[in-house]
Amino acid sequence: MLQDIAETAGQDEETKLQVINTFFNRRVLYRDDWETWGVADYWASPLETLSKGQGDCEDYAIGKYFSLIAAGIPSVKMRMVYVRAQVGGVIQAHMVLAYYPQPNAEPLILDNLVTDIRPASRRPDLVPVFSFNAEGLWQGVSGSSAGDPSARLSRWRDVFAKAKAEGWW
């Protein structure tokens, strides 16, 4: 992974997105938290996910988020987005990573269900519920601020601390 990040040095942000998105989508096998960790819901750090070689949707999004920070993309350009995803005929909870090239731009969606990066408008299967990053928590993707994510999302606070201890920035 570190080699993949290092190879993006000097590359534009779109290239960094492609490299990191492809890396996680190819190297991590989808498994739910019961299969991987023996609990209903666990947010793994990037190194935990990579050491297991498997994870669920949050683990893909978390790995991509911290890898892109390590590659030089500011966290303010990214948000973890909790969505309702239509998979087949079923609506299910899901997590993706949104990248904003400019503050008010349409985000690009990095996902493990759809391997290519697409603008949010080309993902009608996703309905955003809330989004967050190191700087804030929002209703939907562009809604009003809902406060400090570390105070409201204990799993985010925990994985953020683990990623920092692992040296992701």
Please provide the spans of the model-predicted regions.
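A structural boundary/capping signal
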Residues: M1-W169
